[in-house]
Structure formats: structure tokens, C-alpha cells
Amino acid sequence: MDPSGLDTRTAERFETYLDTIGVTLRDKRQRASFATYATGLLGDGSRKSMEPMAARASADPALTSAIHHRLIHFLGSSAWKDAPVRTAAARYAVDELERHGPISTWIIDDTGFLKQGKRSPGVQRQYTGSAGKRANCQIGVSLVLANERAEIPVDFKLYIPQSWADDRKRCRAAHIPDDVGGESKWELALDMIESAVETELPRGVVLADSAYGHNGGFRERLDELGLDFAVDIKSNASVRRVGSNGRLGKPTSVKALARRHVSKFKDATWREGTKGPLRGRVLRMRVVTADSQYRKQSKPMWLLIEWPEGEENPRNYVLSNLKEKMPLEEMLNICGNRWRIERSYQDLKGQLGLDHYEGRSFVGWHHHVSVALVCYAFLAAERARSFSPCGTVTHAGRALEDAA
């Protein structure tokens, strides 16, 4: 979306929006650089790194160089905090999204940032779903809020592996603070969730894959925060089935439990995903976890298993503390909302240059991501405005989608 090509009202909203978010920055030079950078990320051009954005900002070579250096300073050296900027953007978008329905889910996942060299903070050979294999990359963990209509990414943290944390010289070269590094991805996710709770963003059911949900400490902390969750666990997770009389069965893996009750799976169809309606055979039962390390989770929870027709093994195992009387269809719809985080990654990378940052600074990476989140929040709010209460897209909304 090229800001210069917006209709008058949308352009005015964009300018006012930048002013609103800019209040969280310390001085007018930061606010000016912030506006330039945000306009560059939202603007035309296939490459959203600093040099080409500076070139598009001015046809004068001398001025282009000055803009480029100003943007480098803004991202890498200027002292401003990411959290207030991200929170202000999240509130702006959430206010508009909730006109069309309450926030219903908080989605946790991570995405890869492919790299060539070894000096970008956190880079190493590691698995990323972005490539579908191990690759030289950085990993960013994110939190996305979503309702029935749309999604808004509100926070991101760069994963710094233990191999980096053990090399403080390397960390200092990448401007990684001394107290950062070695945290697991699920711990980074909890940091973001706790911040969202503290800033009183509207709550939703926490969704996550097994990289997060399999960890008992992750689930226990969600429960302590008073958050509902429906998270994937691995097939070797040990549980005890709760019988109709309340008695507990022997500890067994969820995979073995699925095979023991294969005749009880039922066909189900739930909401649209990225590739159309989601269908599968599912089984739901009450269980307690058999992990003695997390005794607080000894209360009954739902185990939801998906086993597609014709496949040798079940595909997903979901553990949830959602209410006991929740209808199966409602639970399936909630769990099916996790695909929205993938769409946010597609838009952040495809439209807003999320993975175009070429600097080698931990602070710079987070500053770049913050401005990308600000831009996404504006787009999300504009898209929400383009829908009438009955769910039809207005002419202005179609124009905005075409321009995006």
C-alpha cells in the first residue's frame, strides 16, 4: 500500500495514526524518523531495507544519503523503547477489530528469518517452518491476537540460542544485552503473554503448537495467569483418563490412548483454514496429566485428538483447560483459529518487509519489527473498517485490499 496513493480520508487517518503512536517516542527527531520508516515499509518497492527506502523517500542523492544515515541511527542507536510503541499500535487495531466481535484467541508461534552470514544476532543452523528444514536463520517468537474476522500481531521476541549466550564477546558485537540469551522459546512466549496481561489487552484462549504446549511449565503458568488454553502436545505425553465415575485410569501416552479408542472417533468439519474448510476425525475425552512435576495440572482437562481418515497415526493432540460443558464444535472452532498467525507472517513478510532488516544489532532488529507491527496494526484497522456489520466489503475496503 503506497501512502501517497491513499484517498484523502485514509491518508489523514494514517498521518494522525503516526502522530498518535509517535507520542510514545522521546523527541521530534525520533518521531520524524519513525514516520519516514513506517511510510517506507507501507510504501511501494520490493525491498524494504533502509537504503532502498531512503532512495524512494527522495530523488535528491544528497538528501537520500542523509535520510539513510538518519534511519540507521533511528534503528540501531536511538534510545527508544519498543513496548510502548507496540502497545499503542495494538490498542489502536484492537479497538477497531472489536467492533466486529471480541478478541477470542491469543496465538503463539515462531517464524524464521533466513540469513547468509554468522553475525546477525541469534543466527545459527536450526529448524524453521519458514523453510521447512534446518537453515541458517534467526527465529522470532510472536504473539497474535485474533477474533472471528481478523488478527493483529502485538509482540515479537528474537530467540537467542544457548550457543550465543555462552559467547558474550559475540553477543556484545551484536549489541545483545548481558541479561539476554539462553531463554527457551516457550519462556519468550510467556514473557509476551505476561506483558499482554499486564497491559490489559483483551483476553483470549491461548493457542500454540507442541513446541510450546508440550511443556508443563508453560501450561502451568497460563493457568496461574487465569488464561484458558488449547495447546498441542506430543504423542508421547503421559495422561490418565478420567472415567465416568471420576476414577483415573493408568498413566498412558496419548498416542496409545488414541489407538485404544479408535472406534470412538467421529467425523467433524470446522471453520475455514488457509486451504478451505478443515475436516477430520476427532475424539475428545477428559484426562489429567501424569507429570508429577506439575501437580497443579492434576485437575481434569480436555484431550482432543485429530486422526484423519486413511492416515496411520493421529495428526494432532490438544490439551485444554476450556470449560467441561463446552460443545465439541465450539472447541474445534477455537482450535482452528491458529492458522491466522500464518497469515500474519505472510502479510508482515510479503507486504511490510519484516524479514528485510539487514542490520546486525539486537536492538535494531526489535526496532525494525516494532515499526512493522505498527504498520500491520494500521492495515488491520483499515481492513476492519472496510467491513459492514453484515460482513460485506465496502468499495473503499476493496480499494485498500487492492492497493495493499
Residue spans for each PLM region:
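Generic structural signal for hydrophobic core residues of well-folded globular domains
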Residues: 41-45, 57, 75-78, 322, ...
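Short, solvent-exposed helix-loop connector elements
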Residues: 217, 320, 326-335, 350-366, ...
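Hydrophobic, well-ordered secondary-structure elements that form the walls
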Residues: 342, 374
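Conserved nucleotidyltransferase catalytic core and NTase-mimicking acidic/glycine-rich helix/loop elements
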Residues: 379-404
